[in-house]
Amino acid sequence: MALPRPGCYWGPALLFLSVSPVGSEGTAAKLAQGHADEMTDNQNFEIFLATLPGLEPVLRDEVGSKGFKQARAVPGGVTIKGGWPEVWRANLWVRGAGRVLARVDSFRAVHLAQLDDRARRVPWASVLRPDIPFRVEASCAGSRIYHSGAAAQRIETAIRETLGAPCSAEAEVTVMLRIENDHCTVSVDTSGEPLHKRGYKEAINAAPMRETMASLFLRQCGFDGGEPVLDPMCGSGTFIIEAAEIAARLNPGRARHFAFEKLASFDPEAWQRMREVKSARIPATRFHGSDRDAGAIAMSRANAERAGIAGYTEFRQGTISEVHPPEGPPGLVIVNPPYGNRIGDKGKLAPLYRALGQVLASRFSGWRVGLVASEPRLAHATGLPFLPPGPPVPHGGLRVSLFRTGPLP
């Protein structure tokens, strides 16, 4: 069994659970045209928006609220139906998705020769460009084809020999093959770099929360942009910047490039028109972050400046005991305190959580609280009246949950 050539196959570095895409199987003849009609902007195909396990229903709500058709939560993400314009919009508009995959084809294969044959029928010419390098990532689970490297090689060879596109380990365009229970799903990663990389954040703290996760936690707390938000342990400012961008109706993908710009289906003029549609507004309130670390405050201010929302935010250095609500109506306090990863740390952190709870309970009447914690015991050390927590979500090698309150008395 031949193995992949060095530099062309990266292995199953990313694993996405497959769901059956829309589209016929096509024929072997006329490869360049045979399936092309399936992947045009006038046809619906399946689009998969990935998120962290546990956050699928929250992402589905966001996707549905932004007008995408047939949003459905599935393990690991959300599926929608649409064409290439919907792929572009999903990358540009959706805050909570980690990446956007276009489902190119789906078929059954029980051995490598069958995979090779079916891979040559995929409508590569309607998706990939012959002058743009690509790479392949593959994963196998519960299938008679079990060698992901050999499977990836078959896809790579099919693309090179039918389309002529070069393969490179550094390629921005990634073709993804998932074989599960002998069912093969072929997708193209249309995002490139993960979507939490908004394009503005150069400064981060030691344990950053990804912007995608922060936006979904804000949504879980009922935030829609119309109320103030305060983070008393703001780190590099992720919660506050996301809240300000939501309030200002700024597209999260406005400042970055995407892998779909290198695909055969890309229309630069249509994309430019889409980007030029203005939805921004001036928020009716401001967003506040504080942290005891002066370096964190400097990072937050720099990130807010690069994001273009510095005028809607305020960051100041201070301890938990110095936190007070800003003037105006109540809103949302959202905070991501230290988790205490090492043995013994959790006990040392209990006083911090108690102090946080005392400050919020005594000064923030009418405000709601969202607290991210890996240990229910630490969350409840605040003494705050939490509702049942959300499901555990993987984050930084741990599993964290969002603990929420209603308006504090």
Protein language model regions, located:
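Conserved S-adenosyl-L-methionine
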Residues: 209-324, 347-348
